[in-house]
Amino acid sequence: MSAADVVRIETLGEGALLLHFGEHIDAACNARVQAAAMRLRRANLAGIVDIVPAYASLLLRFDVLNWQRDSSLASALAAIDSESTDAVEIGRLHEIPVCYGGSHGPDISDLAAHAKLSTDEVIALHCGAEYRVAMLGFAPGFPYLLGLDAALHAPRRASPRTRVPAGSVAIGGAQTGIYPRELPGGWQLIGRTPRVLFDVQRETPALLAPGDRVRFYAIDEKEFNSLLAAQG
């Protein structure tokens, strides 16, 4: 079955299309989205000014003065359908240090109790997986990561916090993520990284991009403070 047969197309005003690849959050669907985004960037189709992948959809923004809807859409679908998802480039691997528990991860004990695990087991499971950045959203640079061990799936907090520190590593449902700056949030906080996830002064402000891979490793408070100080 071709991409044109399975992709649902939604028009968003005069200058954008939203391509729907599925209705559920799963790695296979997101792999199709990432593959489509990669192929469209490679195709360099006239009139496309932005390509924004999400969990199960892909936003295409167009220069309304430089595209013909029918021909441009046909070209886009042909590019999407040109290869299998096996051809997706492997994203960059980021190894992210995390200080787990304590004041940096105030919810880790409750999450461990929910999972019927010790906190050490929670940390081992969280560090033992390789995650894929499915999308950025909620706030600039906030990565939604797929690959969380099912034993760590946990509901969001009943009462969201009004302030979550920058760098907080959290779990919400079947996802894990990192708060790029101080924000309100309702995910379960299990640790904090000293890495800066988003900085407008960098050439590429967001540290992570859709399709990138992430592995976490545990550090202690002393190393956390040292790494934090080293970043100025």
Describe the predicted segments one by one:
Residues 2-232:
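Glycine-rich active-site loops that engage anionic ligands at enzyme catalytic sites
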